[in-house]
Every structure is written in structure tokens, then in C-alpha cells.
Amino acid sequence: MSGAALGIEIVVVFFLALFLLHRYGDFKKQQRMVLFGTLLAWYLCFLIVFILPLDVSTTIYNQCLIDQEAQTQTPSVSPVLSEQTTANASISPAKSTQRVCYKPWSYIPDGIMPVFWRVVYWTSQCLTWLLLPFMQSYARSGGFTITGKIKTALIENAIYYGTYLFIFGSLLIYVAVHPQWHLSWYELQTIGITAANTWGLFLLVLLLGYGLVDIPRSYWEASRQGHLLIKTYFKAAKLMTEKADSEENLEDVMEEVRKINESIKYNHPLRKNVDTILRKCPLEYQEKMGRNMDDFEDFDDKQNSYPTERSLSKLHKQVIYAVQRHNRTRVQWQILLEQAFHLEDVAKNETSTSRQFVHSFAPPEPVGWFRRYIYTPTAEWYWECLLKQWFYRVLAVVLALFSVAVVWSECTFFSTHPVLSLFAVFIQLAERDYNYLYIEMACFITIFFLCTCVYSTVFRIRVFNYYYLASHHQTDAYSLQFSGMLFCRLTPPLCLNFLGLIHMDSAISHQAKKQTAYTSIMGSMRVLSFIANGFYIYYPMLIVVLCIATYFSLGTRCLNLLGFQQFMGENEMTSDLIDEGRELLRRERRKRQRIEDGENRRREWRERYAQRDENAARNRTSMSEMKETNYGETLNANTNRQAKYTRSGSQSGRDSIELLQDAEPLDFNAETLTDDPLQSDTGRHAGGRYLSMSSSRNRIFDDV
């Protein structure tokens, strides 16, 4: 298994990142460079999360080998244990003269991990600090040529890059003027990594303090169906306002595009730029603008009334932003409608005596084998109406305990004697028994929980609502690039902070132990002692203050006072928005119900009259065959008596007989007769037999 686990995880993580990108992105419509950059960013960040536990278990094994070698070189002496050593014996691994080191199942040979981490780390840093911000500006640029887009992207990122260069230059000057330090390439590299990790840790603590409280509370609130439904009504009212604003903004921008489209004809030099703008517009607007277009117009006499290329670039950027905003709000509205309708269905089915879950609307996708045989309506009722709320409550309690452990460990991870960090205690207990599988699973679950708290916060806070990850291929390119940039920026300091929690970072724990390969790539933080001994230790304690503020919803109350309406339980404005959202969802439900009823009626009519047409055609075919057979038998049997029953034996006589036999009776009581073949398909003309829907009895004025 030497290196096999590493190779397997590299392949599995790649397909995981590809699957998630396919779920959220659109391979057919979005640019290849956007998809490639996002895939690479996600892949590298997922590699750090999945491979770091293997690095931890391998480091523990190598440390065991070092301790074993040190014991064999020193004589066996029975030490006298002090009270402090005895007290810490339950935490630190027991030392014996005959210590046996067991190789982990996922052992990675020496020399592989440093190269691997160096490639992963520096590639992700190039993506997050250089390429992805540039690609974001390039994708939103209004330029019509590659050169114009590159120029615009460089101008927009000048302040962005200048800020980081200023921070790096300040740290470089600080180190250069220090008399005890002699700068080398390794130390310069460490300064750059320290600057990036410091900025990442600054954002990390702010986001983590909110997520540690909000995620357990969100699951607890999800177990209360009534509260969740009321909150959904509130979100619907706010989202409808934003949706209407985006539609109005799109209409205004499309009006400007229409005016320019009518003024600039096909022989104008800027017409190709206008065509580029039109291709970014929604299809319905493209069709409207393409109807009243002349082929040629002399523009030499009206040169001053035409827009410039710069104004077209500005309009192009406005079109891109307006279309993205409109699509984002439209997708959010559809997702919110599905959630609200589902919650209303759950509320209705809770009082059902049949114990079968009934949906208000048919599912858009056909029912698969899972819902047909396993997740039946009865199983769905028990899950949605009984088990789900209790499962969410238990999960909320577990996550709350996990959050408390994280907060405690963040405040005490710098203490090594005694060991106060809970995660360090658990890892050292498993290290004593060489339970490498437990170590790797504990590391992965902890890192995954921290990543969830951090990343979900960005997409939950209202200020960051511009970025939205929507499934079913509905995420725009800007949100994909932002997510990749954010993951690459926060994952390395998050994992470094985790190594400090479990005392695997010697710069924080100050223990003479073998470092992980990941920590060795980060360099020694002792180059900047005020960061290693100050900021990295005391700044994470700010999580306590942030968690308390989040628990009492201080941020929500402040935003509400500033005019940003937030969900507050006892507030008049909140009650008005809840009522408005309830009415909006009632209208949408009636609208969707009418559409579904109309489709059902059309389907029934098509099935009914398609079957009647099929039966009528089958009857006509069988009757025609029977008549032809009877006529043939009669003709053969009465060949000698042909003159007795016919006036002549000519071919014209037989043809007239066949025409009379094939003719079908007409309904002269029918009000109208039509020869339109399209009406016969709709059931109005079914073989001459379904032309009248009136009664067959005589009317008063039939003889007039």
C-alpha cells in the first residue's frame, strides 16, 4: 500500500470536483477557461482537505521511529515519575524500552509529500491571487476584443494587486531593517506565505465565529416546520422585491440596446460590436429587436448621433451584469418556490390519516426506482412528518457540541503542559494505540466541519448574496470563479490552524517533534516572531466574542436598524413581509395549479380522441376489407348471372359500385362542415361520424 492510498485519493478527489462542477456549472454554455480555472481551484482545495489526514498519520509513524531510535541509542533506565508526569501520562504516549511502531495502512514514503504540497500550495496561490481575479474581471469586461478585455482587467485589478504588494513590501522592509536577520530566498518565501496566511486567518476567524453558531442553529430551526415556513414567506417577499428590481433594470438596459440597435445599421463599422451585445441579451429580447431592422442606411450624414466604442463597451458591461443578476434572482425564486411548496405540503400532510405523503404538484422528473420501491409515499410521510424533525434536532445538538469543542480548542491550543485542546487530546490518545484509521477520520471530519462553517457563511450572509451556488447547472461564471478563489485563499490557513489545534505545528506548540510535510512547506514562523507568538495565538480567541454576538443576533439587529430588513421575530415590518410573502406564494400556487390543470386536460383530450381516431380507422379498415371480400365472392359466384343483376359488365359499372360502397354516410344535421385537416386531428372531424354534438330528434323548423 506504499503510496497507493495517495494515488487513489488523487483520482477520487478529481472526479468529486468534476461531479460538483457539473452539478453547479454548465459545461455547454460557460467558457472553457472559466470551467477549467474553477475545476482546478476546487480540485486543489479538496486535495488539501483529503490528503492532510494521511500526512498526519505518516508524521506520527515517523515520530515513532525517531523515538524508537533514540531509545535504542540510550541505556534503559527506570525513571522516577513525578506527580506532573503521572498526571500527564494519560495524555502523552507511554514510553517503553521495547516500543514497536506499526506502519499505517496509508503510509506515504519520504520525499513524496513535500513535493506534492509544494505543487498544490503554490498552484492554488497563483490561482487565488493572480489568475482568478484577473479572469473575473476579464469575464465581466465590456471590451469587444481580447486586448480590450485584458486592458480593462488590468486596470480594475491595479488597486487589488497594489494592496497586496504594499503589505508584502511592508513586511519585507520590516525584515530587512532587522539587524539580526540575513535575508535568504527561503526566508523571503516564508514572508510571502506568512502574509497570505495572515490575511486568510483574519477572514477565517470572522467567518468561523459566525458559522459555528449559525449552522447548529439553522438545523435546530429546520426541525420546526412552522418557523421555517414563516421564514420562507419572509424570504419570498424580500426576494420578489429584488427580482422585480432586476427585471426593471434589465428592461431599462434592453431599452438602451434597442435604441442603439435601431440607430446602427448593418453597414456601420460598429455593427459587429452591437451584434456582440445582442448575443448577450435574452432570446426574447433578441427576437423583438430583430423584427424592425432595415438592411441599409446612409450614416455619413448622422455621424454625431452615433455612440462611440467606449460607450458601447460600457453598455456591454451593463448588459452582462443585468442579465447575470436577472438569471440569479430567477433561479433563486424558483428554488425558493419549491422549498415553500414542499413545506406547505408537509404542513398539510401532518394531519393526514392515511400516512401517505401527497404532493400538491407532480414532480418535474419521472419517478425512479428509488422512489418507486424504497422511498414510497408511506416512507416519505414517516420521514417528512415524524423522523426528520427529530433527526435535525439530534444533529443540531451534535454540531453544537462540536462547535463548543472548536471554540474551547481555539482558546487553549497554545497550552501544551497541560494539554487543554480537546482535539489534541483525542489525537494523542489514538496515537498511543496506533489507531491510524481513527486519526485520519477524526482529522478529516474536523477539517470538513471547519470548512463547512467558513464557506457556508459566505453564501449565507446577505452582504455576500451576490454570489450564489445554485444546483442544476444554474450557477453563473462569476460565482464559480469567486468560490474557487475563496477556497484557495482560506483552505491553507484553515488547515494550518487545524494543525495547531492538534499540536502538530511546532511554531505554536514549541515542541521538538517532527513536523508534517505540510507545515515544512509553510516555513518557520519564527522569522516573524510577532506573528507566530502574537497574532496566530491570540487572534483566534476573538471567536468567542463573535460567537456570542452571533448567538444574540447582534449583527442582524444592527443591519435591521440600518434599514436592511432582517428576519426578526417580534417586528411589525417582519410581520408585513411575512403576510406579503404568503400572498405571493398563494398566487404562484394558483398560477401553477392552473397551468398543471390545463396540461392535464389537454393530455386527456389527446389520449381520448387519439384512441377514438385509432378505433375509427381500425373499424374503417376492417369494414372495407369485409366489403371487398364479399364483393369478390359474389362476383365469382354469379359470373354466369351477371347480366341479370347489372345493366352492363363494363369496368365503369364496377367502379361506380365500389365508389358507392366506400362512401360513408353524411350527417346532414351537422351545423358546419369543414375540410380543414387540422381540425380533424383535434376531434372535430372524426371520419365523418363526429361532426354533430346535437340531439338526433326533429326540431320545430326542420321542415321550413
UniProtKB/Swiss-Prot annotation:
Subcellular location field: Cell membrane
Chain segments carrying region Disordered: 613-654, 672-704
Positions annotated with a glycan in the UniProt record: N88
Keyword tags: Cell membrane, Coiled coil, Glycoprotein, Membrane, Transmembrane, Transmembrane helix
Listed InterPro entries: GPCR-associated_LMBR1, LMBR1-like_membr_prot
Membrane topology category: Multi-pass membrane protein
A GO cellular component annotation in the UniProt record: membrane
Polar residues compositional bias, start-end: 631-654
Residue intervals annotated with topology Extracellular: 1-3, 55-111, 179-192, 415-438, 503-527
Residue numbers on the Cytoplasmic membrane side: 22-33, 133-157, 214-393, 460-481, 549-704
Positions of transmembrane segments: 4-21, 34-54, 112-132, 158-178, 193-213, 394-414, 439-459, 482-502, 528-548
Pfam families xref list: LMBR1
Stored PANTHER family: G-PROTEIN COUPLED RECEPTOR-ASSOCIATED PROTEIN LMBRD2
Family: Belongs to the LIMR family.
Protein name: G-protein coupled receptor-associated protein LMBRD2B
Taxonomic classification: Eukaryota, Metazoa, Chordata, Craniata, Vertebrata
This protein's encoding gene: lmbrd2b
